[in-house]
A protein has these predicted regions:
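Short, acidic/charged, Gly/Pro-enriched secondary-structure junctions
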Residues: 75-93, 102-106, 294
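Small/polar, glycine/serine/threonine/aspartate-rich low-complexity segments that form flexible
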Residues: 39-56, 60, 65, 104-132, ...
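Sec/SRP-type N-terminal targeting helices
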Residues: 75-76, 92-93, 137-165, 215, ...
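C-terminal structured "cap/appendage" subdomains that terminate the fold
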Residues: 408-440, 446
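Regular, well-ordered alpha-helical segments
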Residues: 86, 93, 159, 166, ...
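Terminal intrinsically disordered/low-complexity segments used for targeting and assembly
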Residues: 1-69, 151, 235-281, 287, ...
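A short glycine-centered flexible hinge/capping loop motif at secondary-structure junctions
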Residues: 207-211, 415-419, 456-460
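Periplasmic alpha-helical coiled-coil/stalk elements that build and connect Gram-negative outer-membrane
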Residues: 2-3, 143, 152, 159-275, ...
Length: 462
């Protein structure tokens, strides 16, 4: 984790609980629910892999790299980091003395006709000084705690950027795989349409030869129109998906280059999930929640120390003379030193309310931290079972498609042999088309579940 030893101490209760098998009062499971029982439980995890080691399609990698530069959410996150870093500088500056230098020279000529004594004389007065403005001695550590809170907020904003990066990588990969699936659907629809048009031609020829009825022709036409109708709908989805990917990558709507087709995209047969305890170190949203907790604990300390006296110093050192020629001589030296102690006595309950507010914010940060951890475990468990079951569904769907393909061929052979009706052959063709579409979607779902699992395990920001 990126926190310093001081930050560790600030969340000591959390770390101690982790060593005891709990975090923020919640038990840390020894393994993820839904993990492959045949895989050994160790510290390796797909979440430790860099995104380009998981998604190996060249065109997909180009899209991800473009998104890393142009994506609006990422650019917003970077701007927030810059703001948080500036806030650290502001907090740190309050711990340091602030100096100012100044000089003034005044020349006065007194009128001869006025009432002033010494009329007609010209007088010059000058001064030059170096001063430090109200420097507070941080006796109780209030300013140090304020700076500590600002630094924790900076680290939290850096972790937030990593969280956004993980989301962007997942969104680009998910959109790309969905686009490839639509390409496969379009190819299947066009091939099916061509096949059905050929069947219609043959059936029309059989009708002319007295071997088929007008009803047979109409039924064949129905399948042609059904296949033809799906094509513009798929093309619409393709363009909309391309537009969405263009937006994620920070570009105007346009075509998206493709790499390998859907059925050639690599998946992992065995996905190691790693140890649940390592997830707490890997996921940036958990680390951000921890840093927010560190910041809120520091702000509680700041609010409490506001009851204590504040000691501030103000000083000035310089030269002053009514004659410029003597400005830098010894007798012209001047200095001022003003120590000041301020003790709040009555603030109308403001300081007590500040403490209550800070404590409430700290409790909110604790709850958010607990919720973030619990949600992380849930997301991993959901993604693991999704990945496993989608692979099982795809395997069964492949068997179903093979069976329906054989059935369709046999049904047409029986129809052409005159031992079965055309309706059975057309029904077989319709069921085969639907099953092939479902198989294409199951291939997409397998890749999408891999994306979701990678995100849930904290991958994508490395």
């Amino acid at each position: 984790m990126n926190g310093t030893p001081i930050n560790r101490f600030a969340v000591a209760i959390v770390v101690t609980s982790l060593l005891a098998g709990t975090v923020a009062g919640q038990k840390v499971p020894s393994s993820f629910r839904g993990a492959d029982s045949t895989a050994s439980v160790d510290q390796t995890s797909i979440g430790d892999l860099k995104w380009f080691d998981v998604f190996k399609d060249d065109e997909l990698q180009k899209l991800v790299r473009t998104a890393m530069v142009n994506n609006y959410d990422l650019r917003t996150a970077v701007a927030r980091i810059d703001a948080a870093r500036a806030n650290v500088g502001l907090a740190r500056s309050e711990q340091l003395p602030q100096f100012a230098a100044g000089a003034d020279f005044t020349t006065t000529h007194v009128s001869r006709n006025g009432q002033s004594i010494g009329g007609g004389r010209t007088r010059s007065v000058g001064s030059i000084f170096l001063s430090f403005l109200s420097f507070e001695l941080d006796v109780w550590g209030r300013l140090r705690q304020q700076t500590k809170a600002a630094r924790a907020e900076l680290r939290a904003s850096e972790e937030d950027r990593k969280t956004v990066l993980t989301i962007v990588v997942g969104d680009v990969a998910g959109g790309y795989f969905s686009l490839l699936e639509l390409d496969s659907e379009l190819d299947l629809a066009k091939r099916t349409l061509a096949s059905r048009e050929e069947s219609l031609r043959l059936i029309s020829a059989r009708q002319q030869g007295g071997l088929a009825t007008a009803l047979d022709v109409r039924q064949a036409e129905e399948l042609v129109y059904q296949a033809s109708r799906t094509i513009p709908d798929i093309e619409r989805s393709i363009e909309q998906t391309e537009n969405q990917l263009s937006f994620i990558t920070g570009n105007n709507p346009g075509a998206i280059p493709r790499g390998q087709p859907l059925d050639q995209q690599e998946t992992l047969p065995l996905v190691p999930a790693g140890l649940p305890s390592s997830l707490l170190e890997r996921r940036p949203d958990i680390r951000a929640a921890e840093e927010n907790l560190v910041a809120q604990r520091a702000l509680v300390s700041v609010a409490k120390k506001a009851f204590l006296p504040r000691i501030s110093l103000t000083g000035l050192l310089g030269f002053q003379s009514d004659q410029l020629s003597n400005l830098f001589s010894g007798p012209s030296r001047a200095w001022t030193f003003v120590p000041q102690v301020t003790q709040p006595i009555f603030t109308g309950g403001r300081l007590k309310s500040d403490v209550k507010f800070a404590k409430a914010q700290q409790e909110f940060a604790v709850v958010q931290y607990q919720q973030t951890i619990q949600n992380a475990f849930k997301e991993v468990a959901d993604a693991l079972i999704q990945y496993r079951k989608v692979r099982e569904i795809r395997a069964q769907q492949e068997l179903l498609v093979a069976t329906l393909r054989d059935r369709s061929e046999l049904a047409y052979l029986r129809y052409r042999g005159g031992v079965d009706t055309l309706l059975n052959a057309l029904d077989s063709d319709r069921e085969l088309f639907d099953a092939e579409l479902d198989l294409t979607k199951s291939k997409r779902d397998e890749l999408l579940s891999l994306v979701q699992l990678y995100k849930a395990l904290g991958g994508g920001w490395q």
